[in-house]
Swiss-Prot record:
Binding, Mg(2+) 2: D190, E226, E230
Protein name, as recorded: Ketol-acid reductoisomerase (NADP(+))
Species: Geobacillus sp. (strain WCH70)
Cofactor(s) in the UniProt record: Mg(2+)
Keyword Magnesium carried by entry: yes
UniProt-listed GO biological process terms: isoleucine biosynthetic process; L-valine biosynthetic process
């Protein structure tokens, strides 16, 4: 079993008298910066000019160009989107890294797939909260935290692991528990979870169920409720207590249906496809395709995104959510762009 680290296992001294540069001020960036500052760490933010720069200054941070922030920092946490990191690293971060600095990531993609090759004179480690930035920030302010993974790729100073734990503690992660992993394990399992279960698997399952009911003559609105809207109720139960708690909480009829019908849907053929997905991740085939897609300015990504946003389940969903005051509408208008930020 994996070892779990808590507050008592981390020592803040590894961050004392050091400056941490947060590169990027999006979902994770704002949470890391504010949590670190509230933990007494000296934090600066590195950005390119734009709305994020203005927001970081509004939040009280000293903001610099990425290159200048790297130059001033002892620890550089790169929290830009995966596809933007290599160019920014090569042009603005790498030239300013000094011996003994720490280069830090929240996801191992670019290190593991050799899109970023760090110099030999710096520590390289990972601190990856297992939750979105707003949750990392909110739980911290409530005195709790979000679990995280740490991994060391390169330890020049002999203190990389201790610094990673200190960083994890400063953002609140050791309050919940921190697991040690490797860049390989974090990257491959994270991509697999997204593709086969949490995002790709789930959205395809929801759409297939919705389409099955609509094609059988049932009202799209009813199909939406049964296949998408109620998902939150089940996921909340799973989050609280795993599969057994969810099954304990639903009706016996639903549980019996789970037992006898679930394996018909997610069967050995599906598991075989999951293994193929994992193989594509492990061999770098997925990474190569995604890198090439970005280099070509995302033609397939954008086309699929537009098509998915026009699916009947999206149209029906927007109409139904507008009728539910207890559901905060997250998406007033779908705007398909080549990048989120």
């Amino acid at each position: 079993m994996a070892k779990v680290y808590y507050n008592g296992d981390a020592n803040e001294k590894y961050l004392q008298s050091k400056t941490v540069a947060i590169i990027g001020y999006g979902s994770q960036g704002h949470a890391h910066a504010q949590n670190l500052r509230d933990s007494g760490v000296n934090v600066i933010v590195g950005l390119r000019k734009g709305k994020s720069w203005e927001q970081a200054e509004k939040d009280g941070f000293a903001v610099y160009s990425v290159r200048e922030a790297t130059k001033q920092a002892d620890i550089v946490m790169v929290l830009l989107p995966d596809e933007k990191q290599p160019n920014v690293y090569k042009e603005e971060i790498e030239p300013e890294l000094q011996p003994g600095n720490a280069l830090v990531f929240a996801h191992g993609f670019n290190i593991h797939f050799n899109q970023i090759v760090p110099p030999e004179h710096v520590d390289v480690f990972l601190v990856a909260p297992k939750g979105p930035g707003h949750l990392v920030r909110r739980t911290y302010t409530e005195g709790a935290g979000v679990p995280a993974l740490i991994a060391v790729y390169q330890d020049v100073t002999g203190e990389a692991k201790q610094t990673a734990l200190a960083y994890a503690k400063a953002i609140g992660a050791t309050r919940a528990g921190v697991l040690e992993t490797t860049f390989k394990e974090e990257t491959e399992t994270d991509l697999f979870g997204e593709q086969a279960v949490l995002c790709g698997g789930l959205t395809s399952l929801i759409k297939a169920g919705f389409e099955t009911l609509v094609e059988a003559g049932y009202q799209p609105e009813v199909a939406y409720f049964e296949c998408l809207h109620e998902m939150k109720l089940i996921v909340d139960l799973l989050y609280e207590g795993g599969l057994s708690w969810m099954r304990h909480s639903i009706s016996d009829t639903a549980q019996w249906g789970d037992f006898i019908s679930g394996p018909r849907i997610i069967n050995d053929a599906v598991k075989a496809e999951m293994k193929k997905v994992l193989h594509d991740i492990q061999t770098g085939k997925f990474a190569k395709g995604w890198i090439l897609e970005n280099q070509a300015n995302r033609p397939e990504f954008n086309a699929i995104n537009r098509r998915e946003n026009e699916h009947l389940i999206e149209i029906v969903g927007r109409e139904l959510r507008s009728m539910m005051p207890f559901v905060k509408e997250k998406q007033k208008e779908v705007v398909v762009s080549s990048a989120k930020n």
